[in-house]
Amino acid sequence: MQTHEIRKRFLDHFVKAGHTEVPSASVILDDPNLLFVNAGMVQFVPFFLGQRTPPYATATSIQKCIRTPDIDEVGITTRHNTFFQMAGNFSFGDYFKRGAIELAWALLTNSVADGGYGLDPEKLWATVYLDDDEAAGLWREVAGLPADRIQRRGMADNYWSMGIPGPCGPSSEIYYDRGPDYGPEGGPVVNEDRYLEIWNLVFMQNERGEGTTKEDYEILGPLPRKNIDTGMGVERVALILQGVPNVYETDLLRPIIDLVAARAPRGYDQGNHADDVRYRIIADHSRTAAILIADGVSPGNDGRGYVLRRLLRRVIRSAKLLNIDTAIVGDLMATVRDAMGPSYPELASDSDRINRIAVAEETAFNRTLASGSRLFDEVAGATRSSGVSVVSGSDAFTLHDTYGFPIELTLEMASEAGLTVDEGGFRELMAQQRRRAKADAAARKHAHADLTAYRELVDAGPTEFTGFDELTSEARILGIFVDGKRVPVVAHGQAVDADRVELVLDRTPLYAESGGQIADVGTISGTGSGSSARAAVTDVQKIAKTLWLHRVNVESGEFVEGDGVVAAADAGWRKGATQGHSGTHMVHAALRQVLGPNAVQAGSLNRPGYLRFDFNWQGPLTEEQRGQIEEVTNQAVQADFAVHTFTEQLEKAKAMGAMALFGECYPDEVRVVEIGGPFSIELCGGTHVATSAQIGPVTILGESSIGSGVRRVEAYVGLDSFRHLAKERALMAGLASSLKVPSEEVPARVASLVERLKAAEKELERARLASVRAAAVNAAAGAERIGNVRLVAQRMSSEMTPADLRTLVGDIRGKLGSDPAVVALIAAPAGGESSTVPYVVAANQAAQGLGLGANELIKHLAAAVDGRGGGKADLAQGSGKKPAGIAAALEALRAEIARVG
């Protein structure tokens, strides 16, 4: 039975039983705590937790899942895969243990003619949690399993959770006995190769807390209702029904292995374990890579992008180790498409993009591999020569940091070479580099010589931010710092560098730079007896995420620790910043509406009148896409959507659909910004407008690449957008006036002028080349003879480029016949004594036979014009810095020819 048929039967079985079929979610979700979807129930978590009401009582799906913790084990055994399909049925307070067991047993054992899988009931076993007598009794009652085929296991095996806080519960697993060829008798507790787990029925009834292993977490209490979450391994059922020993022999992975075998000189399953591992790595990782790219992941250096990059690079290197020297990744992606396309149409519809991204990574990594492999061989040789078998952490770090060689690849190659790597030393050097980078960034940003100076204030409690409600606040000075050192008082004229003076207040309306929004500017003024004190706030930064540091320029009076002050944010600046920040949310929403949910935020910057938004995307946007994004954004602005901000528990906010940045750490309670209901909802601590119309027009300036798989959109907002459009309108009017055409005809007229200019430039180039050729004829005719050598040594016009000189010496040399001949040309610069002097020397074969090689003769030219040069015996070139020495250079050349020739 083919895999697509196994999938179809599963879904049909549960739909017939009243379940709603739900499509697979993407393997990436807007959850910063989850790298990839790793279970079928992930998209249903809000229903299990009672945070949202499910639109159906029961559901069924086949979820794409990715698990990469065991990536290094893939291929070594046939049990590990990074991608798998989890077929599941789910009940949200409807049926419980009996229903789950009855439905699973029926599908597994019903005949093929009746829509089942037709498995032999005598080969099926079940496990239950230690004290789950109810489940054990149901297996005996519903399935007729004898007691010796129902085994009890502890939390590590039969109590399920996602590995993070969330729903959990006891489980019951179904196993298939593959027979004595795969191991001894005794059931799953004895051998899980012979007894293969195919289905896990989770009785989801509790919520778990934090913990690092499968057994050390706390059960927080019962869920609002009892639920069912099951997961059947589609690939495992396929290997049973297809009668093959492992998943790599099934119809989804075997075609990839066959493709590789057709390209590799050594076949699969020929008794070479190392080669078989490489075949399996290619098969598994190619499939996972295609799925990831289809769901919007691009190769990168961290997070999901790094996992994809690592998968593709393991594929490429495994192919190299199989002696496949030609590009193969494109063919692999096509094979995955053909095998998986019937189940996942996006692999076919998005085939060109998937192929383009994967092949680009192959091309880039082949360059790294070529240079890095040579360097590793040198390191390995030096390691052995020193009498040790451990590649130093320093060498591994150099390979990684200087030459881009991944540590995982160094580890693999070292193992293959019989060496190990000081991975601890490598990690420490990486940590040191990160610490240096953070310290450098902090020094550049904060100019804090010693953060311990602020510790007392940090420990005393956070700064109260009042800026969401007011722009002016009364406050008290908690601390004054000059050049990072705490002082009791600071006065006008005491410090000339505004960035060296910092005031810490107990409360402030000035926004500290964070979340992409730059800091407010404003003033801090004294009160009472200190009313003459005034400081301009030029920047506000945070220390330890809780303490606001106001960088100031003291303009008058003095500030004393403990004094009362009035802090005020510049209203115009704040308005512009909020327009920019709200505009960023609008552009983000428009991007996802036009490009799809894979356009995930990677960074942003908002300042008055301007926004910059970085997002994960492969390849440039089309003009049509840019136009659509701009139009969707401005339509939302004109719709005058209400902007709501509120605080919510993190899990509830995510369940509402609030977007979070992957890799960002959030507190339990977060601030949510909602614009226009479902149009935009994000976790955000920034300041925002009250309604979307207050943003004003948004004009996208451009879109560009800022790294592999990351694009950047820049835009003007509000009045700056209007001013930009006004400038463009004036520019267009000026062009129309100069060209004497209506504005709408300017593009066509400019295009026409450009074509005419190109034609004129071509004509000029033809004339110049004709002049060069004529110069060659004239120069050859005027050749002088020194001994047996014919010599053309001339000073040429300043219009001659180095390329012209090379062409010319070749032409002249060809016209001088077979006698010994040398040509030396120097272009006289037009810019005076400070100009560069280019020169070229050519020598024919006969001259070289006399010892007059161009690479030697050029040294005599170079010395006289304070230059350098080099090349081969037939042609050499260089440049000097001393135009006054041109005549002497040519004479020096003549003297050398006279001496030798």
Swiss-Prot record:
EC code(s) of this entry: 6.1.1.7
Cofactor(s) of this protein: Zn(2+)
GO cellular component, one term: cytosol
Domain notes: Consists of three domains; the N-terminal catalytic domain, the editing domain and the C-terminal C-Ala domain. The editing domain removes incorrectly charged amino acids, while the C-Ala domain, along with tRNA(Ala), serves as a bridge to cooperatively bring together the editing and aminoacylation centers thus stimulating deacylation of misacylated tRNAs.
The organism of origin for this protein: Mycobacterium ulcerans (strain Agy99)
Name listed for the protein in its UniProt record: Alanine--tRNA ligase
GO terms under biological process: alanyl-tRNA aminoacylation
SUPFAM superfamilies reported in the protein's UniProt record: Class II aaRS and biotin synthetases (SSF55681), Putative anticodon-binding domain of alanyl-tRNA synthetase (AlaRS) (SSF101353), ThrRS/AlaRS common domain (SSF55186), Translation proteins (SSF50447)
Catalytic reaction(s) noted: tRNA(Ala) + L-alanine + ATP = L-alanyl-tRNA(Ala) + AMP + diphosphate
Keywords: Aminoacyl-tRNA synthetase, ATP-binding, Cytoplasm, Ligase, Metal-binding, Nucleotide-binding, Protein biosynthesis, RNA-binding, tRNA-binding, Zinc
Residues at which Zn(2+) binds: 581, 585, 684, 688
Gene encoding the protein: alaS
Membership in a protein family: Belongs to the class-II aminoacyl-tRNA synthetase family.
Annotated GO MF terms: alanine-tRNA ligase activity; aminoacyl-tRNA deacylase activity; ATP binding; tRNA binding; zinc ion binding
NCBIfam families: alaS (TIGR00344)
The protein's role, per its UniProt record: Catalyzes the attachment of alanine to tRNA(Ala) in a two-step reaction: alanine is first activated by ATP to form Ala-AMP and then transferred to the acceptor end of tRNA(Ala). Also edits incorrectly charged Ser-tRNA(Ala) and Gly-tRNA(Ala) via its editing domain.
Pfam families: DHHA1, tRNA-synt_2c, tRNA_SAD
Places the protein is found: Cytoplasm
Cofactor notes: Binds 1 zinc ion per subunit.
Top-level taxon of origin: Bacteria
PANTHER family: ALANINE--TRNA LIGASE, CYTOPLASMIC, ALANYL-TRNA SYNTHETASE
Main location group: cytoplasm
